[in-house]
Amino acid sequence: MIVIPAIDIIDGKCVRLTQGDYSRVQEYNLDPVQQAKYFEKEGARYLHVVDLDGAKKGSPVNFEVIKRIKESTSLSVECGGGIRDKKTINDYLLAGIDYIILGSVIFKNPEFVEDVLKRFGNERFIASLDFEEGYVKLSGWQEATRISVEEGILHIKKLGFQKLIYTDIKTDGMLKGHNFEAAKYIRSLFDGFLISSGGISSMNDVLKLKDIGVDGVIIGKALYTGHVKLNEIINLV
């Protein structure tokens, strides 16, 4: 199992949201590059980066910061947030970003997604499925849909994704534990590389996900608050 620390960026700063609510923002580091270097020093080999401004706007806002993170570390970086056209994908890949995370565009423009997976290779892309109360949410979690989790995953598989990140918005940033029933359900539906996100509050949460058969776990707020020590959890799993 791989452990992936998370950096979310608003206004060029490292922040965390609570339940995806942009009005409940907490700043943790004015310099995301410095934060990435710290995670690397603690033993991280992977990094999850989201341009939250970009997710809301629908186009990149913090590209230069993310580019500097990649240039300043040897971390394998997966990046998402407002990536909805070929130029943006190309810019990120040319900047050395290892994996591109696609979310809303999967449901809003599936023909485009099918095309870029063929053009650039599906191994460079990760699908992101964000849901609340069993239904998919889009556009930085601001837009509700009536697409069920199962329908969303079937759609993602049909497009040809081999990697999937899922987030239960209700648990995200709450430090109250992960939705393990959702983890089991999604694991049963998706046989590719599965990454869990949202609600991790302890080492025990990570070990439970490992037992379920999840391949990777993204940890955000729990690292910033000290609930989980990155080097300890990496050594444990």
Swiss-Prot record:
Catalytic activities: 1-(5-phospho-beta-D-ribosyl)-5-[(5-phospho-beta-D-ribosylamino)methylideneamino]imidazole-4-carboxamide = 5-[(5-phospho-1-deoxy-D-ribulos-1-ylimino)methylamino]-1-(5-phospho-beta-D-ribosyl)imidazole-4-carboxamide
Enzyme Commission code(s) on record: 5.3.1.16
GO biological process annotation, one example: L-histidine biosynthetic process
Pfam family for this entry, one: His_biosynth
Molecular function per GO: 1-(5-phosphoribosyl)-5-[(5-phosphoribosylamino)methylideneamino]imidazole-4-carboxamide isomerase activity
Pathway: Amino-acid biosynthesis; L-histidine biosynthesis; L-histidine from 5-phospho-alpha-D-ribose 1-diphosphate: step 4/9
Localization, UniProt: Cytoplasm
PANTHER family xref list: 1-(5-PHOSPHORIBOSYL)-5-[(5-PHOSPHORIBOSYLAMINO)METHYLIDENEAMINO] IMIDAZOLE-4-CARBOXAMIDE ISOMERASE
Name the record gives this protein: 1-(5-phosphoribosyl)-5-[(5-phosphoribosylamino)methylideneamino] imidazole-4-carboxamide isomerase
Organism: Caldicellulosiruptor saccharolyticus (strain ATCC 43494 / DSM 8903 / Tp8T 6331)
Gene name for this UniProt entry: hisA
